[in-house]
Amino acid sequence: MKILLVNPDVPLTFWSFKKALKFISKKAVLPPLGLLTVAAILPREWETKLIDMTTTKLRDRDLRWADYVFVTAMVIQRKSVDQVIERCRKIGTKVVAGGPLFTSLPEEYVHVDHLVLKEAELTLPLFVRDLQKGCPRKVYNTHEKADLHQTPIPLWNLIKMKKYAMMCIQYSRGCPFDCDFCDVTTLFGHRIRMKTTNQVLAELESLYALGWRDEVFFVDDNFIGNKIHLKKELLPAIIAWMKKRQYPFSFNTQASINLADDDELMKLMVQAGFDCVFIGIETPNQESLSECNKLQNIGRDLVACVKTIQRSGMQVQAGFILGFDSDKSSIFDNLIHFIQQSGVVTAMVGLLNAPRGTKLYNRLMTENRLSIAATGDNTDFSINFVPKMGIDNLLKGYHKVVSTIYSPRNYHERVLTFLRNYRPGKNNKPRYRYCDIKAFLKSIWHLGIIGKDKLSYWKLIFWSLKRPQYLHLAVTLAICGLHFRSIFESYSHA
């Protein structure tokens, strides 16, 4: 059996970093972890190939080679995956589809040969069994949740690692919280399901053995969902593993704001090699936090929480949302002030959207306020419902926020605000490779010579040269800022 696994292309988005990746000669940020795991579940005697369209062109002869084409997609990849499915139909190659898009919208993909929905550890073996018997069903679904103790190590040999900025692994699925706009719990539930410590170490070892010596992203939606297991087992084991191998990786992940409450956990994460964490802050407006059931953020000094995490040794990236029913016209200036004051450099500010299956979606449907389908990109100036403040006021205010915080002067000043408060871990020493030196020189040209606000760039660089431990990060963030500006400029012009 010949299986071709295809990861559809991703459009130019906030998290694609396409403009920034050119500075370090990379094609994509992350490899398709889901497909690499699916490949590991398939029978060993089957011949498998993987084409990641974010790094490699998909040719018709690749599709003709395969007996089956396995595709996955998030909502944001919908346009690309639809084109792949149509190409397969014309060529006559059967398609097996799974992943978040197809699990959320199976009724819109009845034309696909086989739908293997929910978590692959449960439904894929059933499809394989029936396929080997010659009687595969149209749809495979389940209401159960997978036991991650059975999840295999991804087949890294199917990709070329050098094309990616970082590798990724998964430790857990699920989130204990219940934000009404989030579909994570719809897909994975509230109970935190974890891999064993030995599994995580084995995955790290597999990357290490293949020569990877760079950043690794823990893709968990909330890495700190089970703090006790982290502090007692996983993090101490990673610390020992990293020390024995002279700290080959740095880590980043996603977590909730209550990380700031736990000094011990932050200390262990930094000792293990974590230097960055993404947190859903959403809004400084307490009424809006209550509206969306973001209970873990209510009643806090959110700026102080961010600065606590920064001082512990981790950069805080954060998501923010505009368009809540409780938002007033003052929210735009308040959000700008919050982002600048907190030193959240990578601030993903998006418009509220209601994904299918969420409590927000169901409420808006009841109120007859849904409009178009969500695009999966909440920074593209689209919104799939009628906002209470009016769409024109919301879009005008949104444009003001992103154009202000990503102007070169405000952005570079925010980098300085962060770096002045940041205390990197003692093992978090930047690695200067040829691509890093080349990226620095490119940044001088694009930002320091032909850039829109050269003075603020040079202010950042000269400050960092006096504090060389920050130079690598300062240059990296400056380059990322160029990407962020290009994203919002392209959307606003459109």
Report residues per predicted region.
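Acidic, low-complexity intrinsically disordered segments
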Residues: 1-212
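Conserved beta-strand positions
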Residues: 5, 71, 218-220, 279, ...
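Flexible glycine/acidic-rich beta-alpha junction loops that bind and position SAM and/or redox cofactors
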Residues: 10-17, 104-107, 220, 226-228, ...
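Phosphate/oxyanion-binding loops and surfaces in catalytic or ligand/nucleic-acid-binding neighborhoods
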Residues: 45, 91, 127-134, 151-154, ...
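Radical SAM [4Fe-4S] cluster-binding motif and immediate context
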Residues: 150-317, 324-337, 365, 373
